[in-house]
Amino acid sequence: MNSNAYLEAQRWLSHPRVKPNLKEVITAMSAEEIEHFFSLKKPSFGTAGVRGKMAPGYHGMNVFSYAYLTQGYVNYIQSLNPTKKPLRFLVARDTRKHGALFNGIVCDVITSMGHVVYMFDNNEPTPTPLVSYVIKKYHFDGGVNVTASHNPKTDNGFKIYDGHGAQLLDFQTDQLIAMLPPVVTMLDFEPRGNNELLHFLDNEVVYKNYFDDLKESLVVDNDSFKNLPVVFTGLHGTSVKLLPRFLTYLGYSNIISVQPQNVFDANFANADHLNPESKDTWELARQYASNTKAKLMMAIDPDADRFAIAEWNPQTQDWHYFSGNESGVMVAYYKLKHKQFKRQPYIVTTVVSTDLVDKIAKKYGAFVKRTNVGFKFIGQAVNHFSKDNELVVAFEEAIGMMASDGLNREKDSFQAAAIMLEIARYCHNKGISLLEFYRGEIFGEFGDYYNWTVPHTIHGVNWKEKMEQVLHQLTTATIKEVVGHKITKIKNYVDINLVEYVLENGNWIKFRISGTEPKLKLYFNLSNGYLAALKHEAKKMHEFLVRLLNLDKA
């Protein structure tokens, strides 16, 4: 065990500000956990802020670490506005355990530093896209969101924004971290909040403005087929009240609520899985769909940025769960065909998203901007390009999208629900399914594509180091092909922890370390063939790579 980490753990055990329940947790920690949570390294930001297990220590999410991080964040935002004081911040939270406690600490730090804080009335759990919207709409200088998105219920997080409602980029968080004092000062910082600088928003006014602005982003808004039965689950998260209200506002009259999951619950009692990318997450929704004969289901993750849609496929007698790539492509194709753009249309997506969107953009006169993985990069790109161009869609392969550049700078499940239900109604009017629209109309025009993302969990608190070893192995491997597909080039993007195998015929495989979870993700982009054959090839490639890299099964 690292002796410094052990000594720091002892310091926490003897410190009067550390409560007895936290001391019990420290006492029960393994040597590996002590080394992780009590490391003297400064914290690091992932693709969506700082996330981690709620635990004592410099690298656990606790009242001390939130105060420490907030102090650095406020100093950074002040450095961008050196002559402005007080600054104005929005502070919000999701439905997770200790969220109210943690954002209370954040408020105390900000007000103790002489700045103004706005919160939602009653400290109401708030969707992440709405946080970004309010910062941008009301011209705040920044904002803090206490959320861990779809991470396990044991986790929490610290997500921060600039005055445009966009997440800070890596160079900005690097500057923020440089402003932080040594982590050993964490226990000695006692913020004294000033309630005179704390204000509350009128939630109903904010919701109305948001709904009105969202409605303006639709392509075609009429009353046809708004009685389509659609099952909805919000997984105990921040959308469970607002999303049904929003869809009712748009005129939808047959939204079927998965009631056990559509209540706030910090323990996520009726949702064992929180990521709509996982089919296991949909178990209860499938039961509701079966009982009501609904052919469409929607799932939204706990902080309401990720939206996913699934459709019953009568041919396979099973559900098809649309990926982020598939949803993003459908929105891009639909809007470019049916919307009149007043300025140059553009699409923003990431380096691991499907190449199909480039073909669509080229045919219909749009351009594509690709960013690093993480919506913080997408949001900042939209912020840049929206000045002279008009957004078609910004999307991630991991089921997140933004369909309007006028609202916010986050992936937005409300925007996604509105536009995807609009497309579903368009398909219903044509007598086709969403899947037929995607594989029939779009593939018929541009050829078949198969994009597949496979996450592999890496165990242990030192998971990042283990995965860095895997990436090194990939770049130094002597293999020339992957099950018959010649590798024409190996690209190593060290700064974003990504390795690419460029294959023949424009195909590729990419390997990336997740910035938010202990996972190595494999991305396959295959074309120039029929879908069934492409799927078969991807499966063989994956099996080969699992053996090569000695990975656990996904």
UniProtKB/Swiss-Prot annotation:
InterPro entries: A-D-PHexomutase_a/b/a-I, A-D-PHexomutase_a/b/a-I/II/III, A-D-PHexomutase_a/b/a-II, A-D-PHexomutase_a/b/a-III, A-D-PHexomutase_C_sf, A-D-PHexomutase_CS
Annotated active site: 149 (phosphoserine intermediate)
GO molecular function, one term: phosphopentomutase activity
UniProt catalytic activity: alpha-D-mannose 1-phosphate = D-mannose 6-phosphate
Enzyme superclass (EC): isomerase
Co-factor binding comment: Binds 1 Mg(2+) ion per subunit.
Cofactor: Mg(2+)
Keywords, sorted A to Z: Isomerase, Magnesium, Metal-binding, Phosphoprotein
Keyword Magnesium in annotation: yes
A single GO BP: purine ribonucleoside salvage
Protein name: Phosphomannomutase
EC number: 5.4.2.8
Residue sites binding Mg(2+) per the record: 149, 301, 303, 305
Family: Belongs to the phosphohexose mutase family.
